[in-house]
């Protein structure tokens, strides 16, 4: 019935009204569509556990969707994978393309720990566009949090398509900026190829997400081109995130 409503605005208002009246009704309807069968036999272990189980190994215990995005716009499994991979690989030099509230910036810096160096690059327009200049300063909050723990992170505001930053070869690059085909392609060519052989290139929104959608038609297309060229090999897909290893 709702699918025949005359507009998305009306559909949204109907759902909002029902949710305010009785949230359990909405959860009962939506929950089964989002949750895989909740059994340990079906729990994903995205990272191979080493030295026992760590918290990032337990991310599969949770269901995470855009409904519970917070500071970071990724699922629990994605952030756990990024953190665990970075820490276990011993990565100490990383580049992040695309920064919003600072969630993955903190995750990467925390995983590298002492001696780590992160270059985080963002064009810096989203905050003003989304909040209409209401004075929210996410980069200031991110800087304060990073300084609290002594992390070495450069929060760079600039266009990743043209910006010149000397980083040298790095261990890991996370691309989560411009999601157009051209934008992802440029970011991969300019920054992703700085990954050393054996290092990790992480592409967010490269894997199709059937309910909420991703950018598989653009980021996924770039991923497939990289695999076809042979310089990178696919190592894992975690929700919308693709992990590629530089092999030559």
Region annotations inferred by a language model:
Residues 58-60, 65-248:
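S-adenosylmethionine/decaboxylated-SAM
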